[in-house]
Every structure is written in C-alpha cells, then in structure tokens.
Amino acid sequence: MAQIKIEIAYAYPERYYLKKLTVEEGTMIQTAILQSGILQQFTEIDLRENKVGIFSRPAKLTDQLKDGDRIEIYRPLLADPKEIRRKRAEQQAAQAKKK
C-alpha cells in the first residue's frame, strides 16, 4: 500500500501541538491518533469524549485518511455558548435599567 502524509493538531488557547506522520493509505483517524503518541503526551484527551475533524469539518474516528489531511482533536467547550449569550443579555439589560 502507498504511504500518505498527514498532520495531527491539538490546541490550547496559548499553544498548540502539531505532529506530522506518514501512514498507510486507508488508515482510519483513530489508528493515526494512536500511532502518533498524542494520547500519551496529552492524557486529558479521551477519544470517547473529544470530537475530531479534518480541516475544521467534523469527522468520525472510523473515517479513512487521504494524503495531506490534518486531523484536529477538539477540546470540550468550557461553557455552553447559549448560556454565555443569555448571561450577557441579562447583564446588558441590567446596565440599561441603571441608565
């Protein structure tokens, strides 16, 4: 089988991890992540919980990789976006009443 080149990315707000790998054509996302060693380096990653994607598009762990793909492992959201918007609207309403 042919070899393909891929990247695996995992980011924090202040820094990011990017690893280049060569894998067999047809390798699944999960297999590439396991081969990369990222799970040992970042023990907070749980593939049952963390979502993954290819170039910002959601992907499944069983999806096959193509040459040049960048696997992105997403961190869980710290806060619910709907809840943040609701709180912001409440704060703005409270400030408007004070004026």
Swiss-Prot record:
InterPro entries: Mopterin_synth/thiamin_S_b (IPR016155), RnfH (IPR005346), RnfH_sf (IPR037021). It comes from the Bacteria. Belongs to the UPF0125 (RnfH) family. This is UPF0125 protein PM0166. It comes from Pasteurella multocida (strain Pm70). The lineage of its organism: Bacteria, Pseudomonadati, Pseudomonadota, Gammaproteobacteria, Pasteurellales.
